């Protein structure tokens, strides 16, 4: 997958600078460090391997062509996998991690929508609704239905 994203030449350049090991990729957190100064010499590489995260400091990182390939591949991933999500967990996150993140975004949106729908109609509180249902059923004493509420508790 990386060969497709970055091209064979750029992958060789990248591989010569950092050892990838497993494809549980190393995500480079450049933006935090270089937001103040583009000439910062330090950057942090976060490596995730089998659930454990180790943070290592790489000395002497400067903005070079490898950097451009990282950003290009991140944009490519964002466009191809989930263009509607503005943030991905890491530039080269595994597909499971990306889809998990997208799922969380969808669930959050869904939850917000449902909460909004539930809170939209506050004119008829839950208690009054129960009372109305109870009185209606009392009038129709021959029909004993279970009283259920459609509102979210």
UniProtKB/Swiss-Prot annotation:
Keyword Transferase: no
Cellular component GO terms held in the UniProt record: cytosol; Golgi apparatus; mitochondrion; perinuclear region of cytoplasm
Region annotation Involved in targeting to the mitochondrion: where it falls in the sequence: 1-25
Biological processes annotated in GO: D-amino acid metabolic process; positive regulation of protein catabolic process
Tissue-specific expression: Expressed in the amygdala and in astrocytes of the cortex (at protein level). Expressed in the caudate nucleus, spinal cord and testis.
Interaction with DAO: region residues: 138-153
Chief place of localization: cytoplasm
Compartments where found: Cytoplasm, Cytosol; Golgi apparatus; Mitochondrion
Entry keyword set: Cytoplasm, Golgi apparatus, Mitochondrion, Schizophrenia
Role of this protein: May suppress DAO (D-amino acid oxidase) and SOD1 activity and promote their degradation. Has conversely also been suggested to function as a DAO activator. May stimulate the degradation of DDO (D-aspartate oxidase). May play a role in mitochondrial fission.
Disease entry from the Swiss-Prot or TrEMBL record: Schizophrenia: A complex, multifactorial psychotic disorder or group of disorders characterized by disturbances in the form and content of thought (e.g. delusions, hallucinations), in mood (e.g. inappropriate affect), in sense of self and relationship to the external world (e.g. loss of ego boundaries, withdrawal), and in behavior (e.g bizarre or apparently purposeless behavior). Although it affects emotions, it is distinguished from mood disorders in which such disturbances are primary.
Subunit structure, as described in the record: Interacts with DAO (D-amino acid oxidase); the interaction is direct, can occur in the presence or absence of FAD or substrate bound to DAO, and results in a complex containing two DAO homodimers and two DAOA monomers. Interacts with DDO (D-aspartate oxidase); the interaction is direct. Interacts wih SOD1; the interaction is direct. Interacts with MSRB2; the interaction is direct.
The protein's name: D-amino acid oxidase regulator
Organism: Homo sapiens (Human)
């Amino acid at each position: 997958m990386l060969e497709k994203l970055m091209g064979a030449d750029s992958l060789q350049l990248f591989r010569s600078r950092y050892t990838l090991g497993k494809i549980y990729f190393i995500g480079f957190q450049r933006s935090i460090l270089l937001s103040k100064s583009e000439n910062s010499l330090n950057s942090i590489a976060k490596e995730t391997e089998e659930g454990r995260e180790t943070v290592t400091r790489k000395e002497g990182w400067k903005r070079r062509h490898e950097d451009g390939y990282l950003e290009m591949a991140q944009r490519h991933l964002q466009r191809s996998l989930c263009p509607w999500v503005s943030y991905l967990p890491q530039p080269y996150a595994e597909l499971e991690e990306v889809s998990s993140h997208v799922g969380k975004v969808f669930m959050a949106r869904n939850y917000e929508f449902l909460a909004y729908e539930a809170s939209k109609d506050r004119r008829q509180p839950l208690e009054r609704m129960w009372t109305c249902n109870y009185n209606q059923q009392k009038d129709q004493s021959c029909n004993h239905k279970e009283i259920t509420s459609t509102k979210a508790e």
